[in-house]
Structure formats: C-alpha cells, structure tokens
Amino acid sequence: MNIYIHTLGCFKNEVDSSGISTVLKRAGFNMTSLDEADMVILNTCGFIRPAKEEAINSILRFIDYKKSRGVKLIVTGCLAQRYLSDLADEFPEVDAFVGIGKINCFPDIVNRVIRGERVIEGGDLKDLLNFEIEASPLVYYLKISDGCNNRCNYCAIPLIRGPLQVRRPEDILEEARIAINGGTKEIVLVAQDLTGYNYKGYSTVDLLKDLNNLDGDFWIRLLYLHPARIDETMIEAVSNLPKVLKYADIPIQHIDDGVLKSMG
C-alpha cells in the first residue's frame, strides 16, 4: 500500500505528519508521491477561518481525486478534531475522519479502511505527545509540548488540543541528539507556547541550556513565544547561548496593550 500525506497548517502539523509517516513505515507501508499513492492522508488545520476554508477546499479536491483515481482518503488533524461529526455527515465520500492524538493508531486505521470499513474516530488528547519521528532533515521541527493554558478569547487551540501537556526533557534531548547525528543543522522548537514549558521545575531556559550543550554543528530556533513570560532569564539565555539564534517568533499584536486586552 502506497500512502501520500498532505499537510496543511503550522509546523506542529508537520511534526504530526512526520509521526504518522514514521509509524506507517514501521508497519510496512510505503510513503510516496501523490501520483503513486493508493491512499491519501490529509492532515488539516482548523484554527482560523482561512485555514478552515483551505482545509474544506482540500477535502473537496481530494474527493475529486479519489473519484478519478480510486484512492482511499483519510482526513485527520485539527479540523477533523473540531468538527468530526459534521464533517463525517457532510462528506460521505471520505473513508475516515480521525481526530488528533491518534498517531500510533494509524496502522490499524489504515488497515480498517483497506478492508472497507468507514472509520470515524475522535481524538485522544492524553496521547498528543506519544510518538516518534525517524527522519532527520536539515531543518528539524522538535515539538516540546502541546495544548495551551492561556485561553485567550480569540483562540480555539485549547478547545481543539486541550490544556498544556509537556514532554520529559530527557525525551526531547534524545530526539534532538538523534536528529543532529542524522545530519540536522537547525533544530526548531515548536509548541503552542514555548515559554509555557515547565516539567517539574525544569523550564524552557533549562532546556535551551541543555540543548546548547549537545555535541554537533547546529543551531536552535524558537517559535511561538508568549511575551508575558519572556523575562530577563529568557533574554539572557537567548543572548548568551551560542547555538540559540537571536530570534523570536512573536505575533505583532503583542506590541499593543489595547489589542491584547480585547483579545483576553
């Protein structure tokens, strides 16, 4: 069975798609291009209106592709998590809708679809971080946590992905070490909010220091920092750790107190 994975949305979805690819390859499936695929897995975003519209349009496009090429079609990701029942009713042509946190279940789900079963399966928020990635590209997106506790008025992430969950530091460091040994030159730390990471008192800054001390010729990039928790300790770490890029991804609305207040 040849499988093509098409990913929409943010870098965190890219990480999830890599996890799906890894578990399927270990189960004996082949990851291929769209032209060679017998099955398409569409990993969607469901965060804001344009992302939802893109996801719906992609579902429609792959339904047309399914009709012309006879492939199986699985839709997963945030849109499937958020609107599971509605999507299942609206798009009967789709062979499976799968919520988030089900990465390790994909071999079973794929086999059920192959047997002709239509699978409608909600996500498991307790299992968002329990998966492995084999590939070590030059730029490696390393997820350190999932979910969020901020609950801003405008944001659907806690609704979709639940409260903050963090990975054990030793697991993060081991994954980084494997990636670096495999040729990765840029480790990109991703989370809903990197500054919210805390594992039994071990903070984002502690993690940066330990990552910086790993052997190898690489650098570290930070994405998705909430400015409320960017303190002097964080600034000092970013400034002084040689492998950490002097860069932070912070939404522009955070420069305006009035906008922040209205956002919650």
What spans do the regions from the language model cover?
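Conserved SAM/AdoMet-binding glycine-rich loop
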Residues: L73-G77, R82, L87, N181-G264
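Proteins enriched for Cys/Gly/acidic motifs involved in redox and nucleic-acid/cofactor modification
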Residues: M1-T195, T233, A248
